[in-house]
Amino acid sequence: MTAARAAPRPGLVLVTGASGFVGRPLVAALARAGYVIRAASRRPQAAAVPSGVEWVRLPDLAGEVDWRPLLAGVSDVVHLASATHDEPGMGVEVYDRVTRGALVGLAEAAKAAGLRRLVLISSIRAQTGISSDAVVTEATPAQPTDPYGRSKLEAEAALRASGAPHVILRFVRIYGPGVKGHIATLMRLARSPWPLPFSSFRSRRSLLALENAISAVRFALDETAVAGETYVVADPDPLALPEIMAVLRAAIGRRPAVFPLPAPLLETLLRLSGRADLWQPLTQSLIVSPAKLLAAGWRPALDTRTGLAALMRAEQDRPAGT
């Protein structure tokens, strides 16, 4: 294992996409850890302002962006702002402008300004689709399957070609407070009193705790040895669907209560209920190995079982409407 070497501490860190699901807790965590933060968001007024954080408005990334004012006095950048894979009405051209085009301008401005490091938050979708028969590592040939993934891969290539000092982090699906999508659906199912037809499914999927995503960003900012590298980032322990449901239900004091159902029948039921989108994420494997990042010295803050259980309890206790 290669021992991690601490780089000089960043000065002023620009975080783009700072009011989103990852951005807001990232900004708060970095501020608590003593980083000086300039937080850029399309809706800065919508975010609570931690002490010592400067909030600025992020221009529309689909248009021309002058990055120089945002980079004034900045030593490092964490670039989270991007088109999301589930945003309605997103075409190939918009993905290209918002994800790749904006990154090209940012990388050029960062290099011209002599920035210390640009940490690009990318996605595992730059490397693979929503399932994979083999364990995914950084050495797995990149084969994105949709415009979102292709735009992420092209943004990564543009950053490397720019010559700007950088680290690229490819996150898998993140869970944490306020999570939406498939994880939120599983949590709703876990709260129901009914047995669920999941016990036959043994495919495993990698997830990423929000706390672990934040610790990976801090690692990318602080460590000398990771400069110029690309990492896939996931909790080390992928889980099968019955295991996830058991963890979620145990967290609120319930038995797993799962039973077998033939896969074709479950697929049909999902389609009839209008949730065909759940079929692959729930029943097909996507195992992502963070071995390279672990070998560099990153240590996740918590394991998947602990993280999912804590999230389930927190969401259970959350007052309605918050």
Label each residue range with its predicted role:
Residues 12-33:
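N-terminal Rossmann NAD(P)H-binding glycine-rich loop of SDR-like oxidoreductase domains
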Residues 57-101, 105, 109, 126-127:
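NAD(P)H-binding glycine-rich loop region in Rossmannoid oxidoreductase-like domains
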Residues 104-147, 167:
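Conserved Rossmann-fold NAD(P)-dependent oxidoreductase catalytic core, especially the SDR/UDP-sugar
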Residues 143-167:
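Active-site Tyr-X1-5-Lys
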Residues 150, 179-185, 199-222, 228-232:
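Substrate-positioning beta->alpha
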Residues 176, 198-204, 231-238, 247-253, ...:
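Glycine-rich Rossmann NAD(P)(H)-binding loop
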Residues 210, 246, 269-300, 306, ...:
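Conserved C-terminal active-site "lid" loop/helix of NAD(P)H-dependent oxidoreductases
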Residues 219-278, 309-322:
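Mid/C-terminal beta-alpha module of Rossmann-like enzyme folds, strongest
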